[in-house]
Amino acid sequence: MLLSSMAKHDPNLDRIFQALSDPTRRAMLARIGKGALPVSELARPTGMALPTILRHLSVLEGAQLITTEKQGRTRMCAARPEILAATEGWLAAQRALWEARTDRLEALLQTLTEKDG
């Protein structure tokens, strides 16, 4: 079982979850998800230095959660919702797997209880 799940290892999924592990990046992604924003607008509410913001954006872009594009002197950031949708698919598959396992365990416990009763 472990080997089969390792064979299906997806490094893109690892990058996505690593990017989402930071609350600052999640907040930035939530804001970008409402519409493309310039880097300066993303930096304003955080109080963080621009190099720190750029590192966070680099992680989000590396995970393909956002795209950035230079428009004149402004760098715009836009979300890629299809990447999150793929992540939701993986989570749904995991949820179904674990629900099936707990259903089987519940059925086994019910059978054992009936035998003892």
Spans of model-derived segments:
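Amphipathic alpha-helical dimerization/coiled-coil segments
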Residues: 1-12, 30, 85-117
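N-terminal helix-turn-helix DNA-binding core of bacterial DNA-binding proteins
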Residues: 7, 11-52, 74-85, 89
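Residue-level signal for short amphipathic helical patches enriched in basic/charged
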Residues: 20-23, 60, 82, 93, ...
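Acidic-residue sensor for enzyme active/binding pockets
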Residues: 41, 61, 106
